[in-house]
Amino acid sequence: MNAHRVPATFVSFDGAVSASGVCQRPDRYRFIDAPDPDLAPRIARGGGYSYAAASFGAGSVVQDMRRFNRILGFDPAARIIEVEAGVTLGDVFAVASREGLGLPVQPGYPAITVGGCIAANVHGKNPVREGTFVDSVLDLTLFHPDRGVLRLSPTPCPDCSI
């Protein structure tokens, strides 16, 4: 699908790496799942705050995930929050802090997306004691172009693991 495709220049957070390409800003899952043979390989992009140029590259179509920014569920008693990839840490902190909760790993920039934190396995100020962001992820749902929708977990599962 050509919906929401625009030419764009992507730059790493520190400005050291840049590339020109196509950005797709889907606002519906069907724009992600739909096969589109004229598209180059696609890569998901969060807030774009990584120092590594992990969310763009020559010849790829970047899918900006920031429109997938819903908090789908929150159970303060179980200390579980379910979110879409484009939710920012600031949004998570705002919801969790109302219940006196927070994340053990808290990177310093609130505009970072949860999907970006998982992809980069970010850490806070004390990764030796608190671990990294992925250590707080129970499971995630991922769309793979050849295998479809996968539910991934750090514990053994039939699909694969994170």
Please give the residue ranges for each predicted region.
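Active-site-proximal helix-loop elements at catalytic-domain edges
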Residues: 1-26, 80-82, 131-144
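Glycine-rich N-terminal segment of FAD-binding domains in flavoprotein oxidoreductases
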Residues: 11-108, 121-126
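Short loop/turn segments at beta-alpha junctions that line or gate ligand-sensing/allosteric surfaces
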Residues: 111
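FAD-binding subdomain of flavoenzyme oxidoreductases
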Residues: 117-162
